[in-house]
């Protein structure tokens, strides 16, 4: 089954290979047994339906909800807590068997662990329950019905009953019900943006215009929309075999794997488990050697294992991630999967789509050429750029022609909105010109009303121009305006307007035109030419009837007024965001379905290709040599066409990804986007992918973190993604990266803080076993630390600010969430000082009450025996069992208070890993509150009446709070000295051994 699935997945990753668009229509009809006039017969349709299956997407195998819930309940860190809980119940049962009057400490601890694991499991399941439902979102794109010609009759069928060979009919507003070969059409345009990323409407025809099935004009694809006109076509693929079906199957079949934070927690579990089991085994053996029974040794072993488990850590990590997710949502990054919060911080490469992510997703007039000069239009989102061109003599004429020679109109319901935010009836280029003209003139409709249109030749693909005839403002006659492909417009002109004067269009002026046209086209911009002509009043008097079908007016010998070029301009914040990525060690790769020239131009504008860095094409153009003669290694950047990528093997792609830091992939298919992501992952990189179309969904799913667009993104891309950018802005990703890296550092600090207290919690049990010392702290008291006083301070680390500017992405092999240096600091250094502080307090109180240290060592058996009701202390005073227990529980409380006090300083030193506390400051208000909070909780547990019976916590004399304070101060001084020496000697011994 696994091999079959793997084979199917590899087939889906292959480029689409079709010949149905290239072969003659008659041959296609013979192959499919159909007819271009009458379609299939009913019997043929039934046979084809059985052969090819229904026109529907096959749902992937899904995991039952109860299994998902069990995975959350028993996976990873939860398993460690389950084991701890079970061991507590076993220890309690053993103690109960040995002594029926045993206290229920282990029972309470087991129940507490059970509660923690069930609650965190339920929370994780709730988060996961909202995750990927990719196939459902594909099904939402399915048309409900389709019009089909069968037996020569037009009938309406359910879309899933359409089969290969059917002759289908579509019109404006219809969704294409399957992959079809166009047999006839009239002014048909389709929206392929969700499939190819091409935002412009694509015209359809019966002619094969490209070998690539995604770019030819005689195919229309399942799920895409008909925007204009009507058409008929023969179905060539249905359901899973359609282009969109292949993408759906590919996206739903991919396994995105474990997130970096999940792998880190798994690594942490291995460390903690190994240490706990090893330590427990060692002390079990020591217990035997000291003469303890196997039952006592087993209880000791279980106690040590449980004492090593950080019970509150899972809840702490979950809450930290949740808080960061909420913070990111306020910055327009909506997280669908909690673990993705940290994954974005681990990102070392971003594969970004162009349209709408790096750019504004609106065509805008970028440049103009008039009066023999190229001027830059204001493309800023708030119109704050340079507008000096408005004073030029040729500008008003160019704007007049652009305003009049257009069918585009603003939608009336958006009249109250700013010009750039209004919707337009018309295609993207028309909308760009209309908005630019509106902002330049104040009111295009006013110009049109004063110079009314009387006739029009609409734009068509054969002529490549549009003409309209208008009344003069003074009603004295007519004039015409024309726009279209620049070369077509120029050939119809005999004069040109320069600085308000009409001069002959000679060879010099044509050369100036060609230079400007090439320069604008080389910037990846769509260029249109504009011209006009004053119709003589004696030949075209008022009331003249203009014929648009057989023009009875001149459409040559016109006056050229200028060029306008349009582009979807970069977002204002993107260049700075790309620069920040670079400084943070993140490689940004553009992966787009757009044309290479346009992609390269935008890449240069946003900084993906740095200023002065050349591609092989640039070098070839500069040296005036063929591209084949350029050494690829001499180029600093690469622009790879999808057709070239198709012919590459994995090694060639890997070589490009390794060698170039600046890469643009253009004209890529969905499968190629996926192959690029897999190639980057082979380099050991963590990959973030951005996208908005259905075509992006496989790459979004495969990436370490998929980032979909919230505004322009399709439902499919959002379901495949881990994160959604609510403002569709690439700059928001950088914010997410900064937050992700910060939370990784802060979770690391939180773990360091949490683990440190395990040593003072564990050491009393070791002293109990090794030196027969009466127990200095109880299990319930430990629980009050792990699930009480330590939780809020640990969570407060999520609010800690960064120590420095965005750092380089971490090396997942070398930089772990928990490493040996963190363990060494928490357990071997700070934890040991805390244990000394706790025992110092313990001995002070015991000594003050009569038991000096030399009396306490070896006293355990008599201390715990109810038979001794007259145990003497160092001064000869006799102690009953009840009095001894009251003193013991008072010491437990004091040890607990001592841990809280030394944890004050531990929390403060964990704020930074390198900087001094005095450099970082105490600006984290939540952490400051946490210090007060844990102190209040400790005081509440100690002094609240009834706690002596519930938790065996006893009120302390006020001066018993002071013995641990010197140790707390010692920890602060020690750590400040360590960090000072680390900063003085970067990379030295201290940094290598203690910097975690």
UniProtKB/Swiss-Prot annotation:
Spans traversing the lipid bilayer: 73-93, 107-123, 268-290, 297-325, 762-785, 820-847, 889-909, 926-951
Protein's GO biological process: intracellular potassium ion homeostasis; intracellular sodium ion homeostasis; potassium ion import across plasma membrane; proton transmembrane transport; sodium ion export across plasma membrane
Enzyme class: translocase
Topology in the lipid bilayer: Multi-pass membrane protein
Origin superkingdom: Eukaryota
PROSITE patterns linked: ATPASE_E1_E2
Tagged with keyword Flavoprotein: no
Catalyzed reactions per annotation: K(+)(out) + Na(+)(in) + ATP + H2O = K(+)(in) + Na(+)(out) + ADP + phosphate + H(+)
Active-site residues from the entry: 353 (4-aspartylphosphate intermediate)
Residues the entry annotates as binding ATP: 483
Family matches, as CDD domains: P-type_ATPase_Na-K_like (cd02608)
GO cellular component, one term: plasma membrane
EC assignment: 7.2.2.13
GO molecular function, a single term: metal ion binding
Segments of this protein annotated with the region Disordered: 191-211
Keyword Repeat among record annotations: no
Keyword vocabulary terms for this entry: ATP-binding, Cell membrane, Ion transport, Magnesium, Membrane, Metal-binding, Nucleotide-binding, Phosphoprotein, Potassium, Potassium transport, Sodium, Sodium transport, Sodium/potassium transport, Translocase, Transmembrane, Transmembrane helix, Transport
Binding site for Mg(2+): 692, 696
Localization per Swiss-Prot or TrEMBL: Cell membrane
Function: This is the catalytic component of the active enzyme, which catalyzes the hydrolysis of ATP coupled with the exchange of sodium and potassium ions across the plasma membrane. This action creates the electrochemical gradient of sodium and potassium ions, providing the energy for active transport of various nutrients.
PANTHER family: SODIUM/POTASSIUM-TRANSPORTING ATPASE SUBUNIT ALPHA, SODIUM_POTASSIUM-TRANSPORTING ATPASE SUBUNIT ALPHA
Similarity comment text for this entry: Belongs to the cation transport ATPase (P-type) (TC 3.A.3) family. Type IIC subfamily.
Subunit composition and interactions: The sodium/potassium-transporting ATPase is composed of a catalytic alpha subunit, an auxiliary non-catalytic beta subunit and an additional regulatory subunit.
Full protein name: Sodium/potassium-transporting ATPase subunit alpha-A
Organism this protein belongs to: Artemia franciscana (Brine shrimp)
